Amino acid sequence: MATAETQTMVVGIDDSEHSTYALQWTLDHFFANSTVNPPFKLVIVHAKPSPSSVVGLAGPGAAEVLPYVDSDLKKIAARVVEKAKEICSSKSVHDFVVEVVEGDARNILCEAVEKHHASILVVGSHGYGAIKSCNEDSNVAVLGSVSDYCAHHAHCTVMIVKRPKTKH
């Protein structure tokens, strides 16, 4: 069981292989052989998109579709949580908390860091990167990834776990 002095690690998960790999990597590198006294309190966070963010706010018929979209998003969240629990169990890690919070993953993960006073945030990398502004004088990301956003906004160390590329 985690002690009062144990630092907190937040791991962001979604339904991607990159997220699964990041959780497995984290457990292998930080929690292997430490089932009695884990080095971190582990908090696994899944950001469930809001139905309106998936459907969009306008358009005919959007209101009728929202309950179906919400139902699907809840099912996806349940699968993500179940998979995370299975991964933890397979690695003999039993002392962890899983949270599902509705909202944008970028904000949810940064808020989880604050809420839990986390010293480290672990996220997977999809490898898309940020789409930069066309203006050469600007270094502002117009659109960016969750990992990029968290690296710049989370008030803790951010570890971005990238799956090794397969050799052809």
Predicted regions and their residues:
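Structural beta-alpha unit
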Residues: 1-4, 28, 71, 82-121, ...
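Structural signal for hydrophobic/aromatic residues that build the beta-strand cores
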Residues: 9-12, 22, 26, 42-47, ...
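Gly/Pro- and small hydrophobic-enriched strand-loop and loop-to-helix capping segments
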Residues: 37-41, 160-167
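Glycine-rich, Arg-bearing micro-motifs that act as flexible, cationic patches
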Residues: 120-153, 167-168
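Primary recognition of RNase H-like, Mg2+-dependent phosphodiesterase/nuclease domains
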Residues: 50, 103, 134-136
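Small/aliphatic-rich secondary-structure junction motif
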Residues: 2-67, 87-91, 96
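A short acidic, glycine-rich active-site loop
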Residues: 63-79
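Short, glycine/charged-enriched secondary-structure capping and boundary segments
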Residues: 24-26, 57-60, 113-114, 135-145
